[in-house]
């Protein structure tokens, strides 16, 4: 009896020691995966395009507790810059943390600045950015749809962006075409920011709102970045804004606006594009007018294809880059929904993340004419995922990975090169980057003229007055064009669902 009691005590002590060790290890692992943020430590720090890119930047950061907002700038020699003007927004609470925003202006063009953000109780490490020098030669990177939920998948998305910076080290800003997260929660935004912290610390971000960036709570996207909202038609679930860089004019659309893009936003875009004489006109947006992705079968995609492209045609837009469908597709130049060398090229920019979608071949020649396709790459193994110019083929093995796009502008030449960072089977595997597409556009410079000089703001009254016509326009497209196309496509769709489990 006594021996059995001693054995029982020994076993219980061993179990206690094992459980204690497990708790310590588990705690340590938890801390390594989710570091504890100090009460006044700045986090989720971003520097964004905000207004005049030669002289101005937007700053946004968070703290756990309320504290003052301070941005400090330094030159390349480490001396504090005192001649910049800094305008701070009121600090406000959001989802359990406090949001700090500032706009820094009176900067010098073509200058590298270093900065810290924070307050009296906590200051960030130094970051850096460069202002536009106004010259006609510059480079930038574009990615889309990191859209992760786990720290592991955010890390993989961040590696894709780093591969972009390694491939194009002279990139002056990074465009994120939306869906930063999957469910837009505190935990996911923290994981995103934690994994791209080193990237955001040395560049300017051009963010675009994705449909996943405000799920459940609309204001998430707008509270993550300091953006120029002076002409935005609404500021709840995304922002539309524009800026110049070099000899290019960029407009950012918000496809979370009513039916993807409201009539008010279409009007804003046309006025905006007609108010510039820059050589290149480029539009960034999340959803795409031309796609073979899973959402290409719904009325809002056709609505974009019919309503938005008319504005782009009239304004002479050269390039549209989008995300949303987690695959890469480039169209030939299109105008009036036909191939035209003077038209607009549409780029569905692939996914930088790990969620990758098959194409839907049943959409072909119903919602996207296959003759329009210049390049198509799907980053996922599966049936019929590559378009070779005349037929669907199996996915190429080299295309299995995250996608990033490097764009350079040099006067009258714009070059886009798209790359895949191959997935690794093991951490020790070498990094393999493969170029899978290239676009070169050329034009004569100095040809664009300013034709609009008026006020391009939209009052709340004007916006809501346009809601009914926007829905009527969708109804016309839905019942007049989408529904007949859908029923004609239906047998192929059902075959895809039954035989390939692809909807």
Tell where the protein language model's regions lie, with residue ranges.
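N-terminal active-site segment of His-dependent metallophosphoesterases
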Residues: 40-44, 51-58, 63-67, 93-95, ...
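Metal-dependent phosphoesterase/phosphodiesterase active-site architecture
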Residues: 29-70, 76-81, 89-91, 96-99, ...
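Hydrophobic core positions of the immunoglobulin-like beta-sandwich fold
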Residues: 104-105
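Metal-dependent catalytic neighborhoods of phosphoester/phosphodiester hydrolases
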Residues: 151-156, 180-197, 214-226, 293-301, ...
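Sec-dependent N-terminal signal peptides of Gram-positive bacterial secreted proteins and lipoproteins
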Residues: 4-26
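Short, conserved loop/helix-junction motifs that constitute active-site signature segments
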Residues: 168, 196-202, 338-341
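Active-site glycine-centered loops adjacent to acidic/histidine catalytic or metal-binding residues
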Residues: 145, 178-179, 210-211, 286, ...
């Amino acid at each position: 009896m006594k021996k059995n009691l001693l054995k029982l005590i020994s076993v219980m002590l061993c179990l206690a020691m094992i459980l204690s060790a497990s708790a310590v290890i588990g705690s340590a692992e938890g801390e390594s995966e989710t570091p504890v943020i100090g009460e006044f430590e700045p986090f989720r720090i971003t520097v964004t395009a905000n207004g005049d890119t030669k002289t101005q930047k937007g700053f946004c950061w968070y703290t756990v507790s309320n504290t003052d907002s301070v941005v400090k700038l330094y030159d390349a020699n480490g001396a504090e810059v005192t001649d910049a003007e800094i305008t701070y927004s009121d600090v406000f609470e959001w989802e359990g943390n406090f949001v700090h925003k500032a706009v820094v202006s009176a900067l010098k063009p073509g200058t590298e600045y270093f900065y810290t953000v924070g307050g009296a109780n906590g200051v960030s490490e130094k970051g850096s950015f460069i202002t536009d020098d106004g010259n006609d030669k510059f480079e930038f990177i574009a990615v889309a749809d990191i859209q992760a939920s786990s720290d592991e998948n955010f890390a993989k998305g961040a590696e894709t962006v780093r591969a972009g910076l390694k491939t194009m080290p002279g990139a002056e800003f990074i465009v994120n075409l939306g869906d930063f997260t999957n469910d837009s929660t505190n935990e996911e935004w923290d994981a995103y920011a934690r994994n791209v912290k080193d990237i955001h610390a040395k560049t300017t971000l051009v963010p675009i709102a994705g449909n996943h960036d405000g799920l459940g709570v609309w204001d998430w996207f707008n509270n993550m970045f300091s953006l120029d909202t002076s002409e935005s038609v609404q500021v709840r679930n995304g922002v539309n804004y524009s800026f110049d860089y070099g000899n290019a004019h960029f407009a950012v659309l918000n496809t979370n606006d009513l039916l993807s893009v409201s009539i008010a936003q279409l009007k804003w875009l046309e006025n905006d594009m007609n108010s510039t004489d820059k050589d290149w006109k480029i539009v960034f947006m999340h959803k795409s007018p031309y796609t073979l992705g899973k959402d290409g079968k719904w009325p809002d995609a056709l609505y974009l294809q019919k309503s938005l492209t008319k504005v782009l045609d009239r304004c002479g837009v050269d390039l549209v880059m989008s995300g949303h469908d987690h695959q890469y597709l480039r169209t030939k130049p299109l105008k009036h929904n036909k191939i035209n060398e003077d038209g607009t090229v549409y780029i569905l920019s692939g996914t930088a993340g790990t969620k990758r979608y098959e194409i839907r071949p049943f959409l072909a020649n119903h919602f996207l004419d296959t003759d329009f396709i210049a390049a198509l790459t799907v980053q996922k193994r599966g049936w019929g995922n590559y378009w070779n110019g005349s037929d669907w083929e199996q996915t190429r093995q080299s295309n299995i990975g995250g996608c990033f796009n490097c764009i350079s502008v040099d006067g009258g030449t714009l070059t886009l090169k798209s790359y895949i960072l191959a997935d690794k089977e093991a951490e020790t595997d070498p990094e393999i980057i493969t170029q899978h597409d290239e676009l070169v556009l050329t034009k004569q410079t100095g040809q664009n003229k300013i034709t609009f000089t008026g006020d391009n703001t939209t009052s709340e009254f004007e916006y809501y007055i346009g809601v009914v016509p926007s829905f009527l326009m969708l109804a016309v497209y839905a019942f007049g064009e989408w529904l007949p196309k859908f029923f004609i496509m239906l047998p192929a769709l059902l075959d895809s669902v039954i035989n390939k489990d692809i909807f």
